[in-house]
Regions:
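Residues on the lipid-exposed face of transmembrane beta-strands in outer-membrane beta-barrel proteins
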Residues: 7-13, 54-58, 101, 111-115, ...
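A generic beta-sheet turn/junction motif
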Residues: 13-17, 72, 115-119
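Transmembrane beta-barrel strands of outer-membrane/channel proteins
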Residues: 22-28, 66-72, 115, 124-130, ...
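Outer membrane beta-barrel strand-and-loop segments of large Gram-negative receptors
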Residues: 1, 102, 117, 121-185
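Active-site-proximal structural scaffolding
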Residues: 2-4, 47-50, 72, 94, ...
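Surface-exposed extracellular loop regions of Gram-negative outer-membrane beta-barrel proteins
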Residues: 3-40, 47-53, 57, 62-108, 128-155, 159, 178, ...
Length: 186
């Protein structure tokens, strides 16, 4: 079973041509997994994430605006990533989930310019997204202490997940629209 609880607080203020919008979401997740045939694999995981966002807007004139924004998104690991069951169908290539995974946190900063008139509109933006704790699958050679029940798999390939990934993405977006007449748009 999975239960998600959240609360959001936001604030908006306008000062002449400037607008500032800031918010924060607190999110708690409680996950409990039970296995009827293997109760020793039962586990529970709790997450608590604080997810901020902020936007600064400058209204250049009635039809033009510049906006700078930041937001965070979270991606909770799915049950397959968390499941501690050892899949040993192929005894030389073992898979096991990791119930200790954290939520993946994606941070995005974007700068946007937009202009709208009756004849045309243009929207240009530059964005940068980074993740410092991405959930990634990795493979190693099993090498457990002899006291660990998993030591029977020593020497086999061991596949599992951890928050070890780092991702970066840059995006440039340009949208335009031109309406030379009321019935024709490009």
């Amino acid at each position: 079973t999975q239960h998600i609880y959240s609360a959001y607080l936001g604030y908006l203020v306008r000062l002449n041509k400037f607008g500032i919008k800031a918010g924060v979401r607190a999110e708690g997740t409680s996950l409990k997994a039970s296995f009827a045939r293997k109760p020793d694999l039962n586990f529970s995981t709790d997450y608590f994430d604080v997810v901020p966002n902020a936007t600064l807007t400058y209204q250049m004139d009635m039809s033009s605006q510049i906006r700078l924004g930041y937001n965070m998104r979270i991606q909770r690991p799915g049950i397959w990533f968390l499941n501690p069951y050892i899949n040993d169908v192929n005894p030389q290539n073992i898979s096991q989930g990791n119930p200790n995974l954290d939520s993946e946190k994606s941070n995005n900063v974007n700068l946007n310019f937009s202009k709208f008139t009756q004849k045309f509109s243009i929207n240009a933006s530059l964005s940068y997204t980074f993740v410092n704790n991405a959930i990634e699958r990795y493979t190693t050679t099993a090498d457990f202490p002899s006291t660990d029940p998993r030591s029977q798999y020593n020497g086999a390939l061991w596949n599992t997940y951890d928050n070890i990934g780092k991702k970066q993405q840059v995006g440039i977006f340009l949208y335009g629209n031109w309406s030379p007449t009321t019935w024709f748009r490009i």
